[in-house]
């Protein structure tokens, strides 16, 4: 699968520390974005949840809410040809009006 370019309202969570993703989310919100999608796969799912909770409870309490949570899985083919499934999560944060 070819890597896709993230959209301007998207934060993709990976191996970096949680605070990097919190800062990216806060930066997007400060730029005026009203809906942000935080996406993660596999082991990074817990980091995505931590990111959302830190933004909601520590930095912007009462100012953002979780609008939607989507879970799923993707089939990935390894270098030796085996297929495996990887869990995914998309959390949509939106500004409270």
UniProtKB/Swiss-Prot annotation:
Signal peptide: none annotated. Acetylated. Acetylation at Lys-15 decreases DNA-binding affinity. GO terms for cellular component: chromosome; cytoplasm. GO terms for molecular function: double-stranded DNA binding; RNA binding. GO terms for biological process: chromosome condensation. InterPro entries: Alba-like_dom_sf, DNA/RNA-bd_Alba, DNA/RNA-bd_Alba-like. The keyword DNA-binding applies. Keywords: Acetylation, Chromosome, Cytoplasm, DNA condensation, DNA-binding. It is found in: Cytoplasm; Chromosome. The modification N6-acetyllysine is found at residue 15. Pfam families: Alba. The keyword DNA-binding applies. Its main location: cytoplasm. Belongs to the histone-like Alba family. Binds double-stranded DNA tightly but without sequence specificity. Involved in DNA compaction. This is DNA/RNA-binding protein Alba. It comes from Ignicoccus hospitalis (strain KIN4/I / DSM 18386 / JCM 14125).
């Amino acid at each position: 699968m070819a890597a896709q370019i993230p959209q301007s309202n998207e934060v993709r969570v990976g191996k970096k520390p949680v605070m990097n993703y919190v800062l990216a989310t806060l930066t997007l919100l400060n730029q005026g974005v009203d809906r942000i999608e935080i996406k993660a796969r596999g082991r990074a799912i817990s980091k995505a949840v931590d990111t959302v909770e830190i933004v909601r409870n520590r930095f912007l309490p009462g100012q953002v809410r979780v609008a939607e949570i989507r879970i799923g899985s993707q089939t990935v083919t390894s270098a030796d040809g085996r297929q495996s499934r990887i869990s995914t999560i998309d959390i949509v944060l939106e500004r409270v009006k």
